Amino acid sequence: MPVDSTSTYVDALSEGWTMIDDLQSEKLMKDAGTDYVAQLTGQSDDEYRAYIRRGSLFGAFVRTVRGLTGAIMRKPPQVNAPVKVEELFGDFTLDGKDFNEVVRKVVTENVKKGYYGILVDSPPEGGTPKLAMYAANAILQPTVKRIGNEIKLIGLTLQENIDVPREDDPYETEEIEQVRELKIDEDGFYEQILHVNDGSGWVAGEPIYPTIMGKRLTEIPFVFFGASENSTAPKEGPLLDLGYLNVKHFIITVDYFHALHFCGLPTPFAAGFKLKDGESLHIGSATAWVSEDPQAKCGMLQLGADGIGAIEAALDKLEKQMSVVGSRMLDQARAGVETAEGLLIKQTSDFAILSSIASCTEAGMHDVLVWLARWVGASESEISKIKVMLNKDFSTSEIDPQVLTALFVALQSGTISVDSFLYFLKQKEVLPNHRTIEEEKSLILSGENTELVEKMFGSVVAEDVTDNRLKSASSVNTNGQET
């Protein structure tokens, strides 16, 4: 079995992954040709190329991925990591991505395909560890084994395509295909082997033995990401159905614009007209077609309105289906008022998918940071405190003015605390994301806001501010009385 063999899981999903890659641009869809749009019977190659060029890709899949990714990433990730690890955040990968860019990439790929991977690695000669990122199609074949009560990754092959200078011209590059093999050897230690395709087969290089603080690893530092769970075995991506609908929509647009082409350029026909050798019929205002045959006919052939209407109806139906599958991001605004309960029911499944992707990304990035922390020599105490938190509040609704007024009245009457009021503002993103509730209270209680403090919390607090004897807002109620 060659080193670039793929697992049965990858084989089952690779066609869908390729389709998703092609849906990223109209050019890729058209270049794929008969993979998606069949060549009509009797069409020449030139006619087929003109036929498929008339199609138009409706970017439903791409826009939905951007929308779902944006829902998770609209607030920056919150991270607690050792200082030595945070120092790596600005230059996190081999191609210079920072921490937030890495998280966004993981979320995007989880939304698109539901499978992704990161290898934590460092140069063979040592140095700063970096992250190497692998798309679903590049993760060829993981091998796992039960050791005790755990399922351990003991082998993994990864496809890589790198550009290297040409031997005959150093100013030009050529793409070299290689497979990076990660495995646990017979002695229980981690090693890497690069296999390069020289045109006649795969040639294995010398083994590489990565170390952490001078010690060889006993585990493979590769982290898998998924949409529903972080597993070595890939599952169908959350938007695969949307991808198939988008392809079907593209196929029908090819027929639609092909039909419009012939509607705009109707074909003339004539029957029963006798022509001499070399003679032809011409169209023009000064030309008339005359025949002695009473059965002669002439006219223009074109597609009827009913045919175009049927295609338009099919396109409209597909767009509505994509709207449903794609979390309603493409849905047109509906007339009338929808109840909050009805809206909540419609959003529940969408939010569950987003929440699952966010949770899986959190867990995977936590493991990545743990590997980095070990690599830079962080203590076990520091490692135990590592945490990654992504946004799981996907509601973008604005504050109802009546709700805000009612809460402010409750604040002034002493039926809710200052902290509760500020927490509400924090959740609704009225307060800056980087500012804590305690910092907001300190700003409110600053000397510049004495008049406002008196209006909101009473004269006792205002006097304390003036005298520079600030009292915590949590120990003073809204009537200015100490609690």
Predicted feature descriptions by range:
Residues 289, 317-483:
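C-terminal helix-loop subdomains that flank or include functional centers
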Residues 203-342:
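Extended, charged amphipathic alpha-helical segments
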Residues 20, 75, 79, 95-102, ...:
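Short secondary-structure junctions and interdomain/linker hinges
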Residues 103, 303-310, 314, 346-357:
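Non-transmembrane, amphipathic alpha-helical segments
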Residues 196-209, 294, 465-481:
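Intrinsically disordered, low-complexity linkers and terminal tails enriched in Pro/Gly
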Residues 1-134, 454, 460-483:
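Extended, helix-rich architectural segments
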Residues 111-113, 117-229:
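Extended, regular secondary-structure scaffolds
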Residues 106-110, 245, 311-314, 318, ...:
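Amphipathic alpha-helix face/heptad-repeat signature
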